[in-house]
Amino acid sequence: RADPFIFKHTDGYYYFTASHTDAEHNLDGKYQYRKILIRRAASINDLSDSVGNYSERCVYEREPICGNRSPHIWAPEIHFIRGKWYIYFTTTVSDTDVWQIRPHALCCDGDPMTDEWTNLGPIKTSVEGSRAFTDFSLDHTVFEHHGELYMLWAQKVTQDSDIYIARMSDPTTICTEMVLLTRPEYDWERFGFAVNEGPSIIKHGGKIFMVFSCSGTDARYCLGMMYIDENADVLDASAWTKLSHPVFTMCRENKQFGPGHNSFTRSEDDRFD
């Protein structure tokens, strides 16, 4: 499945979600992504289809408009924030334009595998006149730093897909103006399409690292990286350093193509990220 996300909770279980398609097509011949499934297992290996030692549940489903427009439910992520479970995902918001997609959220305040999930609707901004989420927007992720929540996401303010950051007042509302962190500038970020998307955060060695996806979603899809000192202001774009080369690309020898939109999780013994 595309856009895999794995979260290790304090209960010792791994929770997995990803973009899911049942391989059915709409009338335009496009794959339909209309469900959000979550899996839970005691190990990362147990999450795989081949092992199958997991429990799985559909927590959200949306039928195509008029039967022919895919709702484009993409890139779900499952997070546990301040005592509640959240699933962040992207979906279509228009009855006429399948490409009008925006960030959304679900919430569960009980057992994510058995209790009800509530649709909280689109992610909001409290900043009057902000451009946030007014254009093609997707791949939002959330991280906590020094007691504050921050959201990263990709948005097409121009023809390119860029990555932005903002501070949050709660898990579904940003409360500062969006700050541009990176836009596609190198050749390896512009194969097929000029794209920076799919940000993912990991903290290590006194730094915060953001790994992100670049180029179109074909064999040349790859990963770039930026980092910042953990004591710097994450909303200060000038404090971030962007590598001029990709950190993960296709390997013809190993027949691995299009590595993109990753996530990070903890090892079973909690020694490694």
Predicted regions located by residue number:
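Carbohydrate-active catalytic/glycan-binding domains of CAZyme proteins
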Residues: R1-D273
